Amino acid sequence: MADATEALVLLARLRAGEADAARAAIEAHWPAGGSPFAAAGGTHLARLQIMTPPARPRHRAPGEHLLLAADVDAPLDAWIERLRRAAAGPLDAVLGHCAFYPGAAEPAAFVRWVAANRLSVGFSVIGSPGATLAEVGAALDLRAEIGAFAEAGQRMTPSELHTAWRAWRRA
């Protein structure tokens, strides 16, 4: 059975001196309460941040990079296109600080840039790689319903519990 999820790890070099502007753009366009990643649909989890490599003795200061990591419903290419369409403004505001970023307006150039900056993924932290985001959500809803039923059942007689169970199963 094929996994229902795929992962993307993108590491793009920032243009010299633009790390602070990129951080400000992330803060402005990726607010804690409403990430543009959600607008793409099928996003299990995603992260966007500036990475500063450690300094090495006798070497010039390393360049900073932008990390975009996401675990999403498969197929990944469809998610990337949905993200490009749904979050073009925020993507351009943040990724525009990266070297050679072409912008989200031109789909083919955007896809080529993502591919050029993509890293292979060795693992995923998704607990249910065989389930889509909708399936995970439905399972969590069912778990909550069963929990509520079990709690309510503590106060029922055996006859009431049987009747409630039959009614719940039909719903």
Residue ranges, per PLM feature:
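Short S/T/G/P-rich N-terminal loop/turn motif that feeds into the first structured element of a domain
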Residues: M1-A55, P62-H65, A70-A78, E106-A171
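Low-complexity, intrinsically disordered
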Residues: R60, R84-A86
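Conserved short beta-strand edge segments in small beta-sheet-based binding/regulatory domains
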Residues: G89-G103
